[in-house]
Amino acid sequence: MRKRVVWGVWSVLTMLATPAVAADGPVQIASTIPYLNEQVGSANVRQCDWNARLSAMIIERSRGGVVAAAQEDLSSLPGTTLTIKITRAHTAGGGSVSGPKWGRIRMELREDGVVTGNHSVRRVSNRPFTLSACGPLDKIADALADDVIAWLRKPAIDPNFAWDADLETAESAAD
């Protein structure tokens, strides 16, 4: 019995000490995830700090595998960088009954300037009734952080990836 307890404790400590991402060194990201452009999100979305929370949650959940870069422009940094941009965001704007809230990010992983992976992730809340504009986006940021960490374990290249892909029409038609 004692061996099982010792082994269990050792397993947990090993798991906590091991980074949650599959990279040789720490992956550098921006301390605040930027919006792709000025058209992304409404004034309500831009009042929230969910993009800083998204970065912080990715760093926290990576267990040392992801760190905040010393500069916001990652393109000139050596090593492994993950550029993430918010390409879509929606939150409450018409009172408590404003439908689902969502966020979409696109990300590109580079090792010494060479693209080694890229991906797009979208999360949607299922709670149409909320009095908070920022609360649902915080929950979406938490879910997106988990998605980023899961993808970093096995990054892949999407041949159809484009930063400026116009998903507005396709998503609006699906809603």
Language model: regions and residue ranges:
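Short, low-complexity, polar/charged sequence segments that are solvent-exposed and flexible
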Residues: R46-A52, K101-R106, I140
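Short, charged low-complexity intrinsically disordered segments located at boundaries
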Residues: T83-A92, L137, A170-D175
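A structural "domain/chain start" motif
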Residues: K3-G65, S120-V121, R153-D175
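Hydrophobic beta-strand residues in large extracellular and virion-surface proteins
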Residues: V27-I29, I58, L82-I84, M107-L109, ...
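Short secondary-structure boundary motifs at beta->alpha junctions and helix caps
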Residues: Q39-R46, V114-D158
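Short alpha-helical interface elements
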Residues: L109-E111, S132-C134, A165, T169, ...
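Surface-exposed short loop/turn segments
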Residues: G65, A70-T116, R122, N126-L131
